[in-house]
Every structure is written in structure tokens, then in C-alpha cells.
């Protein structure tokens, strides 16, 4: 509904001689006695108008020119809020747009002609995906879906961490297990990867090569085989919850020199050095962030010669700018919180518009089974695996539970709750609302000859009871919820919203007879049910969960 009010508020401001680029906030009051919507615009602009907020609010109310039959009353409340009361028929006429636009309801073309890249999952290919990585995967996938509703050309990218010390450890781990297959006694380091999958990869190599690799210290074949097997497994796991990527960027390419051309990492060092932001001491190469007011410089190349995470991350982002992306969204775990401000600062120093880079940090996940928390450790081989979770609770529950809490909050994944077939389970609750409507429509077609294909929503203005108006009002919030999700990079807002829609539909279903109502009201209530189903479907598509027609 923000789109409805905005032009009228802007027109009133223009008439009052007030020009502003401040964002006009339009909200729903918690208490309906304060209206259906309200704005704090008088607070925001009182200083520019040289009036107190109540005085400015009163002036603006006199300048609003809402069409007849839309806003029934405007009033000043408290120290200067402007409250709007809408006509019931206006809610219902507006709800017709849901049926008219169908799956396009909530979509805009604000991102048309712009390229966006969303990087997510990007787990090291050192073992099967853990549940913690799954949360970031679903978060990133939902953000990509949200961007597509706004017309962006979206690339979903996986940053393949195939360089660095962890890959050396992986190769060594497989080689140790391979030597055991060859009959040798090996002291396996505690610091190495100990899961059964390491032994399985080693077994494959032994079957293919017998013991011919045992006499060599060369790790290449062990690294390449482990990478291929593990990454194939990662992709299969992600596909089980509907996550696929369009592009895979290999970290090792940032280390490569091509025909005398410096590597991506080296180019970053050279460019920062040209800006006098590189220091060399203690045997390492440093990003001199003390010049930016920080307490310490940050290492880019360690004394061992290995780069820190910061250097390839900076170089990787340079490639995103070079590839022409207008918006770059990165989804990371909480372990990146300290590092990423340095990456953004480096991009600014190098002359890039760092405001195009958006960061979504998701907090850690623990799983509870039977009241017991499961610990995760890939290296120790007792990781809480995403595959096992999907097998246990299903793809829909896995996805929804990962995003039903704010990304900024620690998530406790209650496996038992995710498996419940009751309203306590948020997945069941949402999908049941959709299935209930599908069942109702089938029954209406059979018993009263309802023709879904002919439904236009034209009869909706006949409805004016409180449950009906509350339901229609909630449906019209859908476009604003999409915008809120994008602004905050927070699809959890969509989960909350759809729960509200389902809750209001269940109340409407209980309090407003449908098939037993008079014909005109029956048709209107069936059409209202269709609008609810459409909004649920559109929301489910963003969240990546199915819309069952029966349960």
C-alpha cells in the first residue's frame, strides 16, 4: 500500500513548498484505532518547514487529494503522526489486483537492466556440507529470488575455495588413508580431516591405482580427486533443497600469472602499494589499515608466504566489478564479521564503489534432537550433515526453518518440531492454508459449479466484515514485504508475513461461511480465497518451498 499513498503525500508536500529526498515512511499502526496506515513525515520535515510536527501534519492533511472512496478519514495523532483510515470497499477493489496480476503480483521492474550477483554457500570443498552451511545457502537463494522479482538479471555464484592450506590438509588426509589401504602403518594427525568420506576417497584411488601412488610424495592426484568427489557431493546436496548455481569461481585463478600478466592477488598488492597502503614487516605483507584509524594493520600475505583470506577476497571482488555487476550480495557466516569491513575499505581505496557491495551475515546453527544439541566438526568427522537433516525432515522444512529466524540471530533447529504434522510446525501451518484453499475450490466446483477460470475478483467489494477486511489488508502488504526483505536482506520477514496471511485466512474460514452463503457472497468469498492462494504461492516461490494442493 506504500505505492498508493506515496504520490499523494509527495503532491501535498509539493503544494506546501517542501521538497525532500528523505524516505517517506508509511506503516501500519499496532492498534487499529489509530487507522489503517500512518506516516511520520511531519516529524521528518518539521525543521525544513519551520513548523512543529503537529502544525505541519495539520497543513498536509488539508492538502491531500485522495480519490473518492479510498481514504475515509485522516487525522493528526500524538505529537504529529498522520493516520489514514481506508474504506472497506477500497481494500477489496485493490485486492482484485492479486488475481489480475497473478504470479506477477508484488513484482516490479526497478532492477530492470541491472546485473546482480549473489554469492552464497561457498563452502571449502573439504567435506560434506554441514547444517551451518545450509542456512547461508537458503538465505542466499531466497535473496536471489527476491532480486528476480524486481527485474534484476541475477547470477548465483559459488566461490570455490580450492586454494590455501586447507586444501593441502585435505590432500594429505586422503594420502594418509590411501597409504593405510596399501598396508602401511600411518600416524594420522589430529589436525587433519577424519571423516569416513576421506577413507572412501582413498579407497577409490586404491581401486584405480593399487599401490602405485604410495612411493611418491606428490599430492596432486589426491587433491584433485578429493576436490572432484567432494564438490560433486556438495552440489547434489544443494540440489536436494532446490539450490543451484549459475557460476562457479575458482579461487586458484586469483593466484595465476597469465603470459606475464600479474595474478589477481598481485594486482591488488600493487594497486594498494601505489596508494601507499602496503607495509612490509615481520616477514609479512600488510594492509596498512592504521592509516584508516584502526588499531592494527591487517596481514595480506603471511610470513609463510600464504595469503590471508583478505587478499583473495579483495581480488575476487575486483573481478565482480570488472564483470560489470551493478549489485553484489555476499552471504557469509558469522566468522567473516571481522574481515569484511577491511575488504570494503580496500575496494574504496582502489576506486570502486563499495556501496554496490551488500553483506548478509548469518549466525550459527545448532540442531536439537530429543533435547540434545548436536556438535559440529568437519575435521573430527562427527559433523552434523545437511544431507542427514534433509533426509530426516524434508526439503521444505529444511529451507523454511533456516530462515524463520532473523539471520542476525543464532538458530536452534528443532528437528522434532520440523517433523510434526500440526499447526505448531510453521511449514505445516503455511502449507495447510494453501491446501485448504485448493480443497475448498475443488469442492465448490463440484457442489455449486464454481468456475475458477472465470474468477476476476469483481465481486470482492461485496465483502465488508472485519475478518474479510483484515485478510484483504494483509494481502495488499505483499509488495511492501518484498521491499522490506530486500532492504534488510532478510527473507525471514516473508515467513512472518505469510504466517499472518495464513492465520487471518484460517480465522476468515472459521467465521465466514463460504459454500453455505448466498450465491453472490459465496462467489466473493471464494474469490477472496483465490487471492490468498495466489499470495501464498508467490511467497512460497520466493522462499523456495512447495505449494501442496492436498495434505
UniProtKB/Swiss-Prot annotation:
EC primary class: ligase
Chief localization: cytoplasm
Subcellular location: Cytoplasm
Pfam families, sorted: Arg_tRNA_synt_N, DALR_1, tRNA-synt_1d
Single GO cellular component term: cytoplasm
Subunit organization: Monomer.
Protein's UniProt name: Arginine--tRNA ligase
Species this chain originates from: Chlorobaculum parvum (strain DSM 263 / NCIMB 8327)
Originating gene: argS
